[in-house]
A protein has these predicted regions:
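DPxDG-like acidic metal-binding loop motif
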Residues: 3-5, 69-93
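Short, solvent-exposed loop/turn segments at secondary-structure boundaries
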Residues: 30-32, 68-71
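A short, compositionally biased micro-patch
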Residues: 2-4, 12-14, 62
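Generic structural signal for well-ordered secondary structure
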Residues: 2, 34-38, 76
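Secondary-structure boundary/capping motif
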Residues: 67-68, 154
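Short pre-catalytic strand/loop immediately N-terminal to key active-site residues, enriched for Gly-Thr
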Residues: 55, 60-67
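C-terminal nucleotide
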Residues: 8-47, 51, 87-89, 98-108, ...
Length: 175
């Protein structure tokens, strides 16, 4: 399910590639960082568009990092959409998903894609890896309470734990 938090990204033409993060607690500028997921998504989007421009990307987020609320996927989706928008291009959902997944793979290793799909579609999403995600429309929207414990977690660690458990006890995962 999507939450009412967001990331705003603005892209502009620049003499050098820059990525500037500004959120609740950090203000950071990164120059030419090849392993940064934003840089990776930026490059893949430019490649898809057939462009080779240098860009400045400014990021503002009110999604708490490391809280399990999908901040990395929102970041990757917003980056691809922002870069494409700079060239007056609106990406279809599939292309946006594919471009954002490059960054998610850098961050999480082997993500399912549910966070990217939810960031793109919003609301409640039915997702199964390898199949098209579907938006679930309910007659009445449930109210959810999300509590942040203050403990940061790495999604990639949780993915690895889940994968190991599924490999050790595959019978537990059959429906």
């Amino acid at each position: 399910a999507a939450i009412n938090k967001n990331i705003r990204i603005s892209s502009s033409f620049s003499s050098q590639n820059t990525i500037k993060y500004k959120n609740q607690k950090i203000s950071l500028t990164k120059y030419n960082i090849k392993n940064d997921p934003v840089y990776i998504v930026r490059n893949k989007t430019l490649e898809y568009l057939g462009k080779k421009n240098t860009l400045s990307i400014n990021i503002e987020s009110n999604i708490p990092r490391g809280s399990g609320l999908g901040s990395s996927s929102a970041l990757c989706v917003a980056t691809a959409a922002s870069v494409a928008s700079l060239f007056n291009t609106k990406l279809d959902r599939k292309t946006l998903f594919d471009l954002a997944m490059y960054g998610e793979k850098k961050i999480h290793g082997n993500p399912s894609g549910i966070d990217v799909a939810t960031s793109i579609m919003g609301g409640l999403v039915s997702f199964r890896k390898g199949y098209d995600p579907k938006r679930i429309n309910l007659k009445h929207n449930p109210e959810l309470i999300v509590s942040i414990s203050g403990k940061r977690r790495k999604t990639s660690n949780m993915i690895n734990k889940f994968t190991n458990l599924r490999n050790e006890k595959p019978y537990s995962f059959r429906s």
